Structure formats: C-alpha cells, structure tokens
C-alpha cells in the first residue's frame, strides 16, 4: 500500500464513506479499518487483486470476492459495517510449458475464474509448484487478520 492509496482512503473516509474497495495494483493488499473525522470507521480493502486477467505471476492471478455485513443501527441510528470476509479466487488459463518458455503471450486461452479452494487440479497444470494451501496462506497473511476467509466451494 502506498502513500497515495492511504491518503485517498483517508480522504474518502473523512467524507463519510463506510467502505472503500480498491483495485488497480493487480495484487491483493491489506484490509484495514480507517478512523473517520466523524468518529466512525471505514472498512478499506486497498486492493481486491485480479479477477478475469492473463497476468503471469501467482500473486497477480489471485483475487478475492469481498464481503461484509451491514448492521442496522439501534433505534434508527446509522448502520455500520462489520465482519469483513471473502472467498479467494484463482484465475486460470491454458498455456503449455513450451508456450510459456517461449513467452508466447497470445497463446493463453480457455480463461476461467473459480474459488481458489477448488483450483488444485488447475494449479497442478501450471509451472508454479505452489498448492492451494500455500497460496491461501500467503493471501491471508497479505489481507491481514480482519478478513475471515471461506473456501467458497
């Protein structure tokens, strides 16, 4: 997360936003509560990673479907946001080891996106050598302790 992202999140929070969903850096980034000028807090997902794409790195092919609860306020008071959670996703495409070695980028085909937890077979067809569990662990560490991850399968 860079200074511009933090400044933007703080500005939007101070304007009263309850949630900020960031995209752009092509990788997952941390989730934080940012204090607002009105005393409330804003849930900030700095980056949801990638969804449909043909990026090359494991971290660039991992994303999250973000979720959170909107809790009604007591006695007609303002609603609040709680319990950030999500389902990790994996972006798959077919690309033979020979095509990859030759960097034939236009050879990538059969794009699909699905829950990471259901992607063991697809990951085994890549040259990364990483398991669903390893990617999930790395992703959880990046997102931070606020986010409860569910398998989504």
Where are these regions (language model features)?
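Active-site/ligand-binding-proximal alpha/beta "capping" segment
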Residues: 1, 5-11, 99-108
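A short C-terminal boundary segment appended to hydrolase-like catalytic domains
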Residues: 59-153
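Conserved beta-sheet core of the metallophosphoesterase superfamily
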Residues: 2-64
């Amino acid at each position: 997360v860079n200074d511009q992202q933090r400044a933007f999140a703080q500005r939007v929070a101070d304007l009263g936003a309850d949630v900020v969903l960031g995209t752009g850096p092509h990788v997952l980034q941390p989730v934080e509560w940012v204090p607002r000028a009105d005393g409330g807090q804003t849930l900030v997902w700095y980056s949801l990673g990638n969804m449909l794409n043909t990026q090359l790195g494991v971290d660039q092919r991992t994303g999250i479907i973000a979720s959170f609860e909107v809790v009604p306020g007591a006695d007609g008071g303002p609603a609040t946001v709680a319990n950030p959670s999500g389902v990790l996703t994996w972006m798959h495409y077919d690309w033979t080891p020979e095509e990859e070695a030759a960097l034939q980028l236009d050879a990538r085909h059969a794009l699909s996106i699905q829950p990471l937890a259901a992607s063991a077979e697809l990951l085994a067809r890549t040259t990364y050598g990483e398991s669903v569990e390893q990617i999930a662990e790395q992703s959880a560490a990046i997102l931070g302790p606020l986010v409860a991850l569910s398998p989504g399968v």
